[in-house]
Amino acid sequence: PVANLHVIAVNKNDALQFHRPVNGARAYLAVYGGFEIEKWLGSGSTNLKIKAGGFHGRRLNKSDELPFKCRNDFSALLNKKEFRVLPWLADTSFPDDSKEILVLPGNEWDRLTVTSKEMFASTPFVVTKQSDRMGYRLGNNPLSAVSTEGLVSSAVGFGTIQLLPDGKLIVLMADHQTTGGYPRIGHVITAHHSRLAQLKTGDGIWFRLTDQQTAEELLLKQNQHLLQLQNACTFRLQQYLQKHGY
């Protein structure tokens, strides 16, 4: 079994097993040096709809072999029991652990009625079954706009929140289109994209409006935290290998 936040050493034919998810919807498995996979538009993610990226643009199947970018032979240490699971945990704690999703007002925010604006900031929304990597459709009491006249298709991005004709909302995700004609009432800040990605069907979302300065500060803090985590993991691994004469 593979526990969260641990560094483990594996040998050929070892089987890794994960327990059921407790928090979130997705787990991340990293290997030393990274996987040697096909990149598409600068990403190693797999787009199943157009069969691009990742491993031949498809889901992984039993017996698939993913090559590594960097091969390291730790076999001399694998016989030592204490080397199988290294005695330290990656610290992924982050000061900003709120469950709220911060949003910047979109171009058409002011087209919402006063009541709809209040509902957006005070009512929880629910991720519905009609959700995928292109977008999350949300279950909510219908919101309404004063007017949608004069709208033309405009640029959208990861985290754009659009108001659909039935008053429901959709939050665009990683595989979003590039333009959209529905009102863009808001944009989820970049630092909270990962929170969105961990939501699953039935999960609630609480939105809160913020400003550009706060969004930039949170993104900077997040990037610094991830860089520190990466450097700490590299340092601890090198330190452990040196200690064992490798």
Task: List PLM regions with ranges.
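Conserved "landmark" site that anchors the functional core of diverse proteins
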Residues: 1-246
